[in-house]
Amino acid sequence: MKVNDRVTVKTDGGPRREGVVLEVEEFSEGVMYLVSLADYPAGVWFFNEVDSQDGTFVEPLSQ
């Protein structure tokens, strides 16, 4: 995923939320995405862990 991609994010206890990627930072353990959400337009950081389905919080929006 890259900047300006539309995505969904997993949050605590609720349904997945739609947003837009503002920034991407890669690390050896995974990738961090700054995602703009309706109630957080400046963005919230989410971390996708490498090789862990449970640690995947950001996914591309299915069209």
Swiss-Prot record:
- What protein name does the entry list? Protein DsrB
Entry's transmembrane regions = none
Which gene does this sequence derive from? dsrB
Similarity comment text for this entry = Belongs to the DsrB family.
Q: Which organism is it from?
A: Yersinia pestis
In terms of NCBIfam families, this protein maps to: PRK10708.1
Pfam families in UniProt: DSRB
